[in-house]
C-alpha cells in the first residue's frame, strides 16, 4: 500500500511539472516585421519587437544580437543597459527605445548605418529560464547620382564608351539602351568594392562607326528600384577624322600621278618626243606605284584582320597601334615617292640635244620640279602629323603596357621627323646646285633667243 502511494505521489509531481512547463510555454511569443527592412546607408535603422500577449518586460532580459548569442548588439537586463557586454562597434551607435516596455514593446535604433550592418538581427526576450526570439532581416541600400560616360577617341573601327558609377550597395543592375528603350548588349562589365565595401561599376560599349543614335547608360538598385541614367548622342561629327584621312590619302593619290608625269614632260621638252626615254618614265612609275600599292595593301591587311577581340582589355591599345602604324605608313608613302623621283632626276641630268627654244621652258620646269616636291612633302607631312597629334591628345588608356607603347611611339616619331627633313634637305641641295648651273636669268635667255632668231631670219 505504501509503495502505491509513493508511485502515485511521483506521478502527481511529474504531472504538475509538465503542466507548469505547458503553462510557461504559453507565457508569451514575440512578433515583429516579417519582411526585410531597408536601411539607407548613413541613415538610421529602427527594429521593433513586441511581446504577445502584451505584458511588462522591465524585469526581463532583452538581447539583440547578429550572428552569435554571446556577442550582443544591445543588452538590457533587470532594468539596466549593459553597454560593457556589447560589441564595441555598436556601443556608441545604438540605443534601445523603452517607451512602451510596460506593454512588452522595444525598439532598437542604430545610427550611421554602414554596409556591415546588413544581415539578420535576433530579438530575444528572456524571463527566467523561458525565452523567445524573432529574426528580422535588414537590407542596407546605397544609391548614387555619380554616373558618367567617358568616350574614348573614335578610331578606325568605331568608338568605345565607358559608363562609370560608384557608391552602390548591393551590386546594382547595369545596362545600355538605345533611343527606343531596347537593351544593347554590353561589350564588357566589371565591378569592384572600395574600402567601405560599396560597389564601383564599369560597363563598356563599342559602337560602330557612323551610327547616329542616342545611347543611354542605366543603373538600378534592385532593392529600392531607384534608377539613374545618363545619355550621349553619337553623331557623324565624332567620326570627322575618317573624312580627314580619306582627304589626306586622296591628296597623296591625286598629286602622285602628275608628280610622276613631270618626268614625261621633261623628256618631251628636251627631245621633242618622249619616245627615246619613255621606258625610264615607265620604270619609275612602276616602282612608285608598286611600292605604294604594297604599303596600302599592308594597311588594309592590318585593319581588316581581327587581331584582338573587342572584349579584350588590350583592344583599345591595339586599335591605337593600328592608327599609328597607318600614320607611319602614310609618311613612308610620301617619302618613298619623293625618294624615287629624286633618285630618278639625279640620274637623268643629261640634257644634250635640248633645242635652244626649250631652254627657258626647261629651266621653269626644273624650278617647278624642285619646288613642287618640297611643297607637297611639307603639306602632306604636316596634315598627317597634325591630325595624328589631335587624336593623341584625346587618348587616355589605363593599360600598363601603354607606357611601353608610348616609348616605342616616340622612336617612331623621331623616324618620321627624319623622313620629313631628309627629302627637304635634298630639295635644298638640288635647288642650290640648279641655281649655280643657270648662267643668266631666264628672261635674259629669252631675249638672247629672240636675237638669235632675228639674226637667222636676216
UniProtKB/Swiss-Prot annotation:
Record has Transmembrane as a keyword: yes
Positions annotated with a glycan in the UniProt record: 200
Transmembrane segments: 238-258, 284-304, 325-345, 360-380, 415-435
Subcellular localization, as worded in the UniProt entry: Membrane
Extracellular side stretches: 25-237, 305-324, 381-414
Cellular component, GO, one term: membrane
UniProt key word Cell wall biogenesis/degradation: no
Membrane topology note: Multi-pass membrane protein
Function description: May act by engaging a cell surface molecule on immature T-cells in the embryonic thymus.
Note: Encoded by one of the 11 copies of Skint genes clustered in the D1 region of the chromosome 4.
Cross-referenced PANTHER family: BUTYROPHILIN, SELECTION AND UPKEEP OF INTRAEPITHELIAL T-CELLS PROTEIN 2-RELATED
Protein name: Selection and upkeep of intraepithelial T-cells protein 3
Organism of provenance: Mus musculus (Mouse)
Gene: Skint3
Amino acid at each position: 500500500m505504501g509503495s502505491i502511494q509513493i508511485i502515485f505521489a511521483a506521478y502527481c509531481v511529474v504531472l504538475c511539472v509538465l503542466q507548469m512547463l505547458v503553462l510557461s510555454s504559453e507565457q508569451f511569443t514575440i512578433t515583429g516585421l516579417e519582411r526585410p527592412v531597408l536601411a539607407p546607408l548613413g541613415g538610421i535603422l529602427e527594429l521593433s519587437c513586441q511581446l504577445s500577449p502584451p505584458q511588462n518586460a522591465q524585469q526581463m532580459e532583452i538581447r539583440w544580437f547578429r550572428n552569435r548569442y554571446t556577442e550582443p548588439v544591445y543588452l538590457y537586463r533587470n532594468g539596466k543597459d549593459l553597454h560593457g557586454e556589447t560589441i564595441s562597434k555598436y556601443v556608441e551607435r545604438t540605443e534601445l527605445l523603452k517607451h512602451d516596455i510596460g506593454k512588452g514593446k522595444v525598439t532598437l535604433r542604430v545610427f550611421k548605418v554602414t554596409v556591415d550592418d546588413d544581415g539578420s538581427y535576433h530579438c530575444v526576450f528572456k524571463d527566467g529560464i523561458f525565452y523567445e526570439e524573432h529574426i528580422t532581416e535588414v537590407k542596407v541600400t546605397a544609391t548614387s547620382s555619380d554616373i558618367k560616360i567617358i568616350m574614348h577617341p573614335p578610331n578606325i573601327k568605331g568608338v568605345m564608351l565607358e559608363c562609370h558609377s560608384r557608391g552602390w550597395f548591393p551590386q546594382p543592375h547595369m545596362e545600355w539602351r538605345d533611343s527606343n528603350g531596347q537593351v544593347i548588349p554590353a561589350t564588357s562589365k566589371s565591378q569592384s568594392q572600395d574600402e567601405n565595401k560599396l560597389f564601383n561599376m564599369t560597363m563598356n560599349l563599342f559602337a560602330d562607326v557612323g551610327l547616329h543614335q542616342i545611347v543611354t547608360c542605366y543603373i538600378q538598385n534592385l532593392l529600392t528600384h531607384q534608377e539613374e541614367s545618363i545619355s550621349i548622342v553619337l553623331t557623324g561629327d565624332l567620326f570627322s577624322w575618317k573624312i580627314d584621312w580619306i582627304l589626306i590619302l586622296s591628296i597623296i593619290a591625286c598629286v602622285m600621278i602628275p608628280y610622276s608625269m613631270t618626268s614625261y614632260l621633261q623628256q618631251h621638252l628636251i627631245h621633242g618626243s618622249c619616245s627615246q626615254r619613255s621606258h625610264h618614265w615607265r620604270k619609275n612609275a612602276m616602282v612608285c606605284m608598286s611600292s605604294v600599292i604594297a604599303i596600302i595593301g599592308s594597311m588594309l591587311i592590318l585593319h581588316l584582320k581581327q587581331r584582338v577581340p573587342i572584349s579584350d582589355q588590350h583592344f583599345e591599345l591595339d586599335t591605337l597601334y593600328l592608327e599609328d602604324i597607318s600614320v607611319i605608313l602614310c609618311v613612308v608613302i610620301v617619302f618613298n615617292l619623293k625618294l624615287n623621283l629624286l633618285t630618278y632626276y639625279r640620274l637623268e641630268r643629261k640634257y644634250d640635244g635640248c633645242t635652244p627654244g626649250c631652254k627657258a621652258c626647261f629651266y621653269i620646269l626644273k624650278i617647278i620640279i624642285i619646288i613642287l616636291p618640297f611643297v607637297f612633302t611639307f603639306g602632306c607631312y604636316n596634315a598627317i602629323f597634325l591630325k595624328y597629334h589631335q587624336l593623341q591628345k584625346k587618348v587616355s588608356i589605363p593599360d600598363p603596357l601603354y607606357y611601353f607603347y608610348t616609348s616605342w611611339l616616340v622612336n617612331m616619331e623621331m623616324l618620321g621627323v627624319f623622313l620629313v627633313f631628309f627629302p627637304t634637305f635634298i630639295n635644298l641641295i638640288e635647288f642650290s646646285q640648279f641655281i649655280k648651273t643657270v648662267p643668266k636669268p631666264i628672261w635674259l635667255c629669252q631675249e638672247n633667243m629672240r636675237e638669235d632668231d632675228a639674226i637667222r631670219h636676216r
